[in-house]
Regions:
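Active-site loop-to-helix "anion-binding N-cap" substructures in soluble metabolic enzymes
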Residues: 1-193
Length: 193
């Protein structure tokens, strides 16, 4: 997000790291989760800095979904979470409803990653709801990442409803942020021989 500076008007986020940086006790249990712990510590300062500097352009999920006692989907407002009790597996319906208007008003929308554990139908609502909203617009839409493109196929959406779909999420982000792409550089060098 930091590399995109003023080129982006609005960020609609569903990730646990951003919620943690904003002071909400969500995310994975960090005990025994070395990979998540390392990722969080590596990104913490950057995320907190971006939230501080661009907070007016960033919207975080307002509610989250988890597995209720009956095994079904349950939702809770983020503001009502005072301690980590559940594994939050998707954004909630209010978040999707809140994200739809800015998506529909945009000239361009870029998506990287799913908003929930979409492989489990109970927790696909966030991912599918946002992808549906994007698919219904006339704006330029870029979708990046293997999971996101897989969700398109799993839930009956058509890649034709999006301007660009990439299964290479990392390369997609590097291209958006202007970082060099080694494969493209190699092709350019070969073409100039």
């Amino acid at each position: 997000m930091d590399a995109l500076d003023d080129r982006v008007d609005r960020f609609l986020l569903g990730g646990a790291q951003e919620q943690l940086a904003a002071g909400h006790p969500v995310g994975h249990d960090l005990e025994g989760m070395d990979l998540f712990d390392e990722q969080w510590e590596r990104n913490r300062e950057l995320i907190e800095s971006v939230l501080d500097e661009r907070g007016d352009a960033i919207r975080l999920a307002s509610d989250l979904a988890y597995e209720g006692e009956d095994g079904g989907r349950a939702e809770v407002a983020v503001e009502d979470i005072d301690e980590k009790r559940e594994a939050y597996l998707d954004v909630g319906a209010a978040t999707v409803d809140g994200y739809e208007p800015p998506i529909r008003e945009s000239d361009a929308v870029f998506v990287k990653g799913a908003l929930g554990v979409f492989e489990d139908e109970r927790f696909a609502d966030g991912t599918v709801g946002v992808l549906d909203a994007i698919a219904e617009t006339d704006c330029f839409s870029g979708v990046g990442g293997g999971d996101t493109s897989r969700a398109i196929g799993m839930y009956g959406l058509s890649e034709d409803d999006f301007s660009h779909v990439s299964i290479a999420g990392g390369a997609y982000i590097r291209a958006l942020t202007g970082e060099p792409l080694p494969a493209v550089e190699a092709l350019e060098a070969a073409a100039n021989r």
